[in-house]
């Protein structure tokens, strides 16, 4: 298997290959400094400096079974990871330089997806109370009670905050196949942003609020599998002016987590 870490620049509509690996690497986050990317592979976390691309291991202590749901705090001081243990996936925080993880999620399974712009709240998805579907939740960075935001039927996933923190974008299959939805950061005013025949996942608004990036699967796809023909699409934040900008083999692990450059000029995948 070969994996490719790439960057798409909006202005030039060009692709730059950062790294090629002979194993599976996934889910790039762009660090706030703009100088490196964070990726996962083989249950571990790696930092990739853009000036001299290579995979530098990040110390995650006992957490050695990471999935592709990880991210960096807005101020760059913390990393959140989702690590599999006996209860399933759990969320932990650790220093950005690495260190021993601190458990955040009071229950499991939990998968992180978004960080509020003020750095105080985490958005994630979880299965609770015997429900067979996944809902969107939030919790403070210091732990405490979790708040369930989605209540209806259907699988909801991939929550990510608007740059002003007022809204959360997510995908949900409540009305059939997965489409892009948006709601208030408190769970209010849940509504489908648009509908088409594609199976749409993992919406990510750009830091400047000008664009919405999402992953599109072929019609009829169930879940978010890997190794399918997919497209990365851009839209306006209100769901208008949708267009496909890249097509390749991918899916699970392509853009599960926020991947925009800090200046909104590019995204990694």
Where are the predicted features?
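Blade-level signature of beta-propeller repeat domains, shared across WD40, Kelch, NHL, RCC1
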Residues: 251-269
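Solenoidal tandem-repeat scaffolds enriched in leucines and small polar residues
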Residues: 109-117, 121-162, 170-173
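Multi-bladed beta-propeller domains
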Residues: 7-24, 50-66, 94-109, 139-157, ...
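Residue-level detector of Asp-centered blade-edge/turn motifs that repeat once per structural unit
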Residues: 32-33, 74-75, 117-118, 163-164, ...
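Loop/turn-rich, solvent-exposed surfaces of beta-rich toroidal or solenoidal domains
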Residues: 197-233
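Beta-strand C-termini and the immediately following turn/loop, strongest in propeller blades
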Residues: 31-32, 37-43, 79-86, 115, ...
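Structural motif
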Residues: 2-5, 44-46, 87-92, 131-137, ...
